[in-house]
A protein has these predicted regions:
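N-terminal twin-arginine translocation
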Residues: 32-40, 47-66
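Extracytoplasmic/periplasmic C-terminal soluble domains
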Residues: 202-261
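Surface-exposed loop/turn elements that mediate protein-protein interactions on large endomembrane-trafficking
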Residues: 70-101, 125-145, 178-196, 226-249, ...
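N-terminal secretory signal peptides
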Residues: 1-33, 45-53
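A generic tandem-repeat structural signature
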Residues: 153-226
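Short beta-strand elements that form the blades of beta-propeller/WD-repeat-like
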Residues: 111-120, 163-170, 213-222, 263-274, ...
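Post-signal peptide N-terminal segment of secreted/secretory-pathway proteins
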Residues: 107-162, 166-172
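Repeated scaffold domains used in trafficking and secretory/extracellular systems
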Residues: 101-110, 150-159, 200-209, 251-261, ...
Length: 425
């Protein structure tokens, strides 16, 4: 055990109506913040965290361990407001490749040269299929043409790495679901699919990710179901395993989707349960399954997304809380325990992606491109003829290739295709 979307709700695959909501306003100018103070503050936080690496929400023996202090930031000098403190520049990112997919396709890029595809049906008489897109060649291949559980089940979600292909099938009539995985080699399935988890209407369909030879997922009770008081689990299955094993337990639901970036898993279990509702955004090295960093959110503040990139968390809050200080505000934050934090005051819609000091943050119809080292930001606009909600990130966390997708109109003004774009970072 670790030391501490159809259904893509937490993926923020929102429709056009949901994305017409107004952006949050900026916050006041933050005095006293310079690049040097930000770097020095981050270094101090790194040293403090290194001393406390044994702090986590789960233990090897499952026992409760002491967590870090909730981060109630009231000193605004510890916050760098992107739109006020950084310089606005023209975006220099260039499209390295672009492909048009059939209308309704949704790509998911976990890592490497492959993106899993939820493919739209070819006609009203056929069902969705699952496929894969080579980001090196643009070749699209159908891998699974019908649900393994029979005609009453439909494809619900899909992910892949270079070595494993995983998907959820669900019966919308009963709420039953299964999580399956199958080895993948050079974009082709190997062997037979293996059912690695399942649930009924009391359990939310697995939130999952793929990395290397592993599938990692969260099994949680529905917040309003009869099992809502049950413990949630984060599990791992590797190609060749007979059974999955539990990595972490949470007394209550995890707050965020499991995200994997450069071999580091980020999850947000409940912590400090005797003191109230607290979420600990926690990063684990998957090679050792040891905690490398943790940030405890203010009481009752639930993170919307979180991923560990470099030596900082990139996380977001989707509502304005009446308490909690700065971290109780709606927006996206980059930082770690003790601060300082880079803050973008915009409604969060998806997981952050990027490389090094460059972060791409989805905001309404475009992406903010934030460079914390250069102290600049720019706007990556959606492709021509994109629908009003613009493009969404298919990638997550640290990546050499940022992948986005958008529904674009044809010459007649109607939605015609899904345009996938890749940007070298």
């Amino acid at each position: 055990m670790l030391e501490r979307g159809h259904g893509h709700v937490r993926e923020a695959r929102a429709d056009a109506g949901a994305d017409t909501r107004a952006e949050a306003s900026g916050v006041a100018k933050r005095p006293g913040v310079t690049r040097r103070s930000f770097v020095v503050g981050s270094a101090a936080a790194t040293a403090a965290t290194a001393v406390a690496l044994n702090l986590s929400g789960c233990g090897d023996d499952g026992a409760k361990k002491v967590t870090g202090e909730p981060q109630v930031i009231t000193d605004e000098s510890k916050v760098v407001d992107v739109t006020e403190d950084y310089k606005n520049e023209d975006c220099t990112l260039q499209v390295s490749a672009s492909w048009d997919l059939p209308l309704g396709c949704v790509p998911f890029h976990c890592e490497g040269d492959w993106a899993a595809l939820m493919q739209a049906p070819e006609s009203a008489r056929s069902v969705n299929t699952l496929g894969i897109l080579s980001l090196a060649s643009g070749t699209r291949t159908t891998l699974v043409d019908r649900p393994s559980q029979g005609s009453t089940f439909s494809f619900y979600d899909v992910r892949c790495s270079a070595q494993v292909f995983a998907w959820v099938e669900m019966s919308y009539a009963t709420g039953d679901w299964v999580l399956l995985a199958q080895p993948l080699q050079n974009g082709a399935l190997q062997g037979k699919p293996k059912k690695i988890d399942s649930g009924n209407a009391d359990w939310e369909p697995a939130r999952f990710a793929a990395t290397g030879d592993s599938v990692i997922w969260q099994k949680m009770p529905l917040a309003t179901g009869s099992k809502r008081s049950e413990t949630s689990h984060c599990n791992r299955w590797r190609v060749g395993d007979k059974e999955p094993r539990v990595l972490c337990e949470s007394v209550g639901r995890f707050a965020t989707w499991p995200r994997i970036s450069d071999g580091t898993l980020t999850i947000a279990p409940r912590v400090n349960n005797d003191e109230g509702v607290f979420y600990g955004i926690t990063a684990y090295d998957l090679s050792s399954e040891k905690m490398v960093d943790q940030l405890v959110m203010p009481q009752n503040v639930s993170p919307f997304e979180a991923v560990y990139m470099g030596d900082s968390f990139a996380f977001s809050v989707e509502a304005n809380y009446q308490s909690g200080g700065v971290l109780g505000k709606m927006g996206t934050f980059i930082g770690r325990e003790g601060g300082p934090f880079v803050f973008l005051s915009r409604e969060p819609l998806a997981c952050v992606m990027g490389k090094g000091s460059t972060y791409l943050i989805k905001a309404q119809s475009s992406h903010f491109v934030v460079d914390t080292k250069a102290e600049t930001y720019s706007v990556l606009v959606a492709p021509d003829k994109a629908l009003g909600y613009g493009d969404y990130p298919a990638s997550e966390g640290a990546t050499n290739r940022a992948v986005t997708y958008a529904t674009v109109r044809g010459d007649n003004g109607l939605p015609a295709a899904v345009r996938v774009r890749a940007f070298g970072l």
